[in-house]
């Protein structure tokens, strides 16, 4: 089968190191009847060993040439190919207990992580290859330089663990950054959760819009509605110093106080 030229517009970097592939599959630990969805299968580096261990795999691939290649390589009863941009796919359609895996396109990694939150109720776990710097932000703690909107939004929904680094030489073509593999498991239904997901997202986005400024200045007219002492947030605090639970409390308090611009559930 002819070689496929990596396409920059799709952020393609094909994993070629078999030892890394084996480490990822071992971390996933797939069982024969698992419901697995792979994003960006590319040249089948993960697809092949996954299909050695499970009965059926669903693959989401935007590149029509690679999608056609996958259909030629594997029978339809083993592999379902969804030819689409992962950012437009409703992952909830694939059922309950999903195990989502993939070497995610680095040019859309953050938007894709936010998009996948919409299907978190259907997901058992997620194992992704990403830029190491993105994973550092995902798992960052308050007060660190990597703590960001991405940290807060994902930590409110998932338990996350950085598993191991992957050198650029493991890919063709090699990316200019170090990569890593992360495990994401949705938090249980009884987790601390905001009264309104939309309000929470709006508050966090506003707070981090000027992360170096004091939060009370960034919040503007919302600051007067904020019960600072009750939330345990110093009025001089910056967004990067506020914990996930405090952000949930802040969003709920502002929503209850009728803060303008916040959507009610």
From Swiss-Prot:
PROSITE patterns in the record: RRNA_A_DIMETH (PS01131), SAM_RNA_A_N6_MT (PS51689)
Domain of life: Bacteria
CDD domains reported in the protein's UniProt record: AdoMet_MTases (cd02440)
Cytoplasm as UniProt keyword: yes
Subcellular localization(s) per the UniProt record: Cytoplasm
Catalytic activity: adenosine(1518)/adenosine(1519) in 16S rRNA + 4 S-adenosyl-L-methionine = N(6)-dimethyladenosine(1518)/N(6)-dimethyladenosine(1519) in 16S rRNA + 4 S-adenosyl-L-homocysteine + 4 H(+)
E.C. no: 2.1.1.182
InterPro entries hit by this protein: KsgA/Erm, rRNA_Ade_diMease-like_C, rRNA_Ade_Mease_Trfase_CS, rRNA_Ade_methylase_Trfase_N, rRNA_adenine_dimethylase, SAM-dependent_MTases_sf
GO molecular function, one term: 16S rRNA (adenine(1518)-N(6)/adenine(1519)-N(6))-dimethyltransferase activity
Pfam families linked: RrnaAD
GO CC entries: cytosol
Binding site for S-adenosyl-L-methionine: 13, 15, 40, 61, 85, 103
Entry keywords, A to Z: Cytoplasm, Methyltransferase, RNA-binding, rRNA processing, S-adenosyl-L-methionine, Transferase
Stated role: Specifically dimethylates two adjacent adenosines (A1518 and A1519) in the loop of a conserved hairpin near the 3'-end of 16S rRNA in the 30S particle. May play a critical role in biogenesis of 30S subunits.
Family: Belongs to the class I-like SAM-binding methyltransferase superfamily. rRNA adenine N(6)-methyltransferase family. RsmA subfamily.
Name used for this protein in its record: Ribosomal RNA small subunit methyltransferase A
Record organism: Bordetella parapertussis (strain 12822 / ATCC BAA-587 / NCTC 13253)
Gene transcribed to yield this protein: rsmA
């Amino acid at each position: 089968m002819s070689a496929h030229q990596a396409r920059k517009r799709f952020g393609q970097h094909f994993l070629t190191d078999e030892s890394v592939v084996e480490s990822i599959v071992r971390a996933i630990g797939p069982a024969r009847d698992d419901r697995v969805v792979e994003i960006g299968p590319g040249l089948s580096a993960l697809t092949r060993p996954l299909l050695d261990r499970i009965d059926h795999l669903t693959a989401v691939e935007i590149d029509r040439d690679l999608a056609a290649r996958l259909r030629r390589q594997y029978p339809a009863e083993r592999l379902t190919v969804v030819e689409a941009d992962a950012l437009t796919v409703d992952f909830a359609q694939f059922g309950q207990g999903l195990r989502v895996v993939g070497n995610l396109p680095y040019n859309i990694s953050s938007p894709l992580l936010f998009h996948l939150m919409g299907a978190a109720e259907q997901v058992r776990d997620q194992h992704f290859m990403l830029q190491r710097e993105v994973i550092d932000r995902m798992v960052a703690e308050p007060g660190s330089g990597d703590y960001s909107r991405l940290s807060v939004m994902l930590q409110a929904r998932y338990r996350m663990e950085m598993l191991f680094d992957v050198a650029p030489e493991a890919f063709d073509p090699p990316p200019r950054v170090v990569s890593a593999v992360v495990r994401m498991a949705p938090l249980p239904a009884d987790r601390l959760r905001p009264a309104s997901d939309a309000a929470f997202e709006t508050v966090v986005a506003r707070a981090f819009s000027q992360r170096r400024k004091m939060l009370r200045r960034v919040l503007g007219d919302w600051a007067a509605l904020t019960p600072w002492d009750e939330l345990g947030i110093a009025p001089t605090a910056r967004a990067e110093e506020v914990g996930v639970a405090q952000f949930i409390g802040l969003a709920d308090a502002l929503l209850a106080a009728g803060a303008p611009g916040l959507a009610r559930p």
